[in-house]
């Protein structure tokens, strides 16, 4: 964990890092992210570089050191480039539609599923069978994509359902006829 925690994080152009006693705030034109910092970790930003140090070598401190460093790196990447997850819908009659801040999914159930899009997330539909989830928070983008996928996970026989783009679904063979 200490090797990850000891790395220096370069601050991208146009990104502002503010360090408070128990909080780190990362701002840019895309938005703002905050992260609470435990008391055993110290964060410093100078000359375009963010560094993290730990107070002692207790196992818990070492774990938090690497975790906080990775979270700050994700924040820096999120406010500069953003994060994106792509989902594909496979199945006859399965489709998605966007109306305001609601995503309506028709997934073979007796009713359409309405998913309220959280603040800070942008969903686009290039096709009715393709969903693109974008935002600055890596955690929130992954969570929203996982929630949408959980409405109808891909099944192994025909591959019907919602899957991540470029993710291979392991297929099973159907029943074979008896002799």
Swiss-Prot record:
One of the GO biological process terms: cytoplasmic translation
InterPro entries for the chain: Ribosomal_uL6-like, Ribosomal_uL6-like_a/b-dom_sf, Ribosomal_uL6_a/b-dom, Ribosomal_uL6_bac-type, Ribosomal_uL6_CS
Cellular component annotations (GO), alphabetically ordered: cytosolic large ribosomal subunit
SUPFAM superfamilies named among the record's database cross-references: Ribosomal protein L6
GO molecular function, one term: rRNA binding
Keywords, in A-Z order: Ribonucleoprotein, Ribosomal protein, RNA-binding, rRNA-binding
Transmembrane segments: none
Pfam families: Ribosomal_L6 (PF00347)
Family under the similarity heading: Belongs to the universal ribosomal protein uL6 family.
Subunit structure comment from the entry: Part of the 50S ribosomal subunit.
Function field: This protein binds to the 23S rRNA, and is important in its secondary structure. It is located near the subunit interface in the base of the L7/L12 stalk, and near the tRNA binding site of the peptidyltransferase center.
Protein name: Large ribosomal subunit protein uL6
């Amino acid at each position: 964990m200490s090797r990850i925690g000891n790395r220096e994080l370069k601050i991208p152009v146009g990104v502002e890092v503010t360090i408070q006693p128990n909080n780190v705030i990362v701002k840019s034109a895309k938005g703002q992210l905050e992260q609470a910092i435990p008391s055993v970790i110290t964060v410093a930003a100078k000359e375009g570089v963010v560094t993290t140090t730990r107070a002692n070598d207790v196992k818990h401190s070492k774990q938090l050191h690497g975790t906080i460093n990775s979270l700050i790196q994700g924040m820096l990447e999120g406010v500069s480039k953003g994060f994106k997850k792509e989902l594909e819908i496979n199945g006859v009659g399965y489709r998605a539609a966007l109306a305001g801040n609601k995503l309506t999914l028709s997934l073979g159930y007796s009713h359409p599923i309405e998913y309220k899009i959280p603040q800070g997330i942008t969903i686009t539909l290039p096709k009715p069978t393709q969903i693109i989830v974008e935002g600055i928070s890596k955690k929130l983008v992954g969570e929203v994509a996982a929630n949408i996928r959980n409405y109808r996970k891909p099944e192994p026989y025909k591959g019907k359902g919602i899957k991540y783009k470029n993710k291979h679904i392991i297929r099973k063979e159907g029943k074979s006829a008896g002799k």
